[in-house]
Amino acid sequence: MRHRKQGRKFGRTSSHRKAMFKNMSASLINHELIKTTLPKAKELRAIVEPLVTLAKREHKLRQELDTNSNEFKAQSVALRRQAFDFLRNKAAVTKLFEEFGARYAERAGGYTRILKCGYRFGDKAPMAFIELVDRPQVEEAADEE
């Protein structure tokens, strides 16, 4: 029976599933918006939100402690290593801690938004955009006359 089993399998081995979500997490952090299937987006939300919370904790430490103190450095490195242990992407970890910690400092959770966007052409799988809320809008160069 499947009682109290968390997570979805997606027809993949556990190592394939872990690798897929590590890559998707790094992509979401780097691009702040990705398109994927709805079940994957729902599962990804549960993975990315704790990573943003790590960045918020480091931002809070940065405000409370002197950034040159050994206590701050030790805790900051520990938090970054926890994030890197999952992501395995230096650029994503840097962006996570440098941008998202400050951006979501006042938000108490709910850092991602899932927007349904129809069905995939080939197999009618439900598709969705998953994005980080409060992301800066990219201004498109539109010629208005």
Curated annotation (Swiss-Prot):
What keywords would UniProt list here? Answer: Ribonucleoprotein, Ribosomal protein
Single GO term (MF): structural constituent of ribosome
A biological process term (GO) from this entry: translation
Provide GO CC annotations from the record.
Answer: cytosolic large ribosomal subunit
Tell me where on the tree of life, at the top rank, the source sits. Answer: Bacteria
Q: Which InterPro entries match?
A: Ribosomal_bL17, Ribosomal_bL17_CS, Ribosomal_bL17_sf
Subunit structure, as described in the record: Part of the 50S ribosomal subunit. Contacts protein L32.
Per the record, the similarity remark reads: Belongs to the bacterial ribosomal protein bL17 family.
Q: What is this protein called?
A: Large ribosomal subunit protein bL17
Organism annotation:
Francisella tularensis subsp. tularensis (strain SCHU S4 / Schu 4)
Gene of this entry: rplQ
